[in-house]
């Protein structure tokens, strides 16, 4: 993820809006099992540009995306983000669950081997705290629910 230069917060929120518009198009298309990296722009902006941008102003867009994928049986990924802030955060995970979302996978975002499986137990606990009882694995695009 690349975010150009040091800009004001309005610029970064415009980047997030554009990203979420594309995520919504992807959700409407719906030919996949799990939507990953839902909150990627915030991670990139906050980590690379040392900002504290929040997804709160974009929750209506997030909710629209979630309301689009849930009836299609599409899940979301809970990414451990290398042990940093989980992606998405607890607010979005709780929203997904409250809307009826059940399919949730765990990813470690391992770009290097020492991040492989990083923080999975902590994210399992987070999922339990957000109301999930299972996480999902797939075999040939068929979901299988594993007890948390």
What are the residue ranges of the model-derived segments?
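Extended substrate/RNA-proximal surfaces in nucleic-acid metabolism proteins
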Residues: 1-71
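Charged catalytic cores and adjacent phosphate/nucleic-acid-binding surfaces used
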Residues: 50-148
């Amino acid at each position: 993820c690349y975010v150009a230069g040091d800009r004001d917060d309005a610029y970064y929120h415009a980047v997030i809006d554009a990203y979420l518009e594309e995520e919504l198009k992807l959700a409407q298309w719906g030919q996949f099992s799990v939507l990953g990296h839902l909150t990627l722009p915030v991670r990139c902006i906050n980590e690379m540009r040392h900002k504290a941008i929040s997804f709160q102003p974009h929750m209506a867009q997030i909710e629209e995306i979630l309301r689009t994928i849930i009836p299609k049986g599409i899940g979301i990924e809970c990414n451990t983000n290398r042990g940093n802030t989980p992606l998405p955060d607890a607010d979005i995970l709780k929203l997904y669950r409250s809307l009826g979302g059940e399919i949730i996978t765990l990813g470690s975002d391992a770009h290097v081997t020492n991040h492989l499986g990083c923080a999975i137990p902590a994210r399992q606990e987070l999922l339990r705290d957000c109301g999930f009882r299972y996480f999902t694995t797939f075999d040939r695009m068929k979901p299988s629910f594993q007890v948390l």
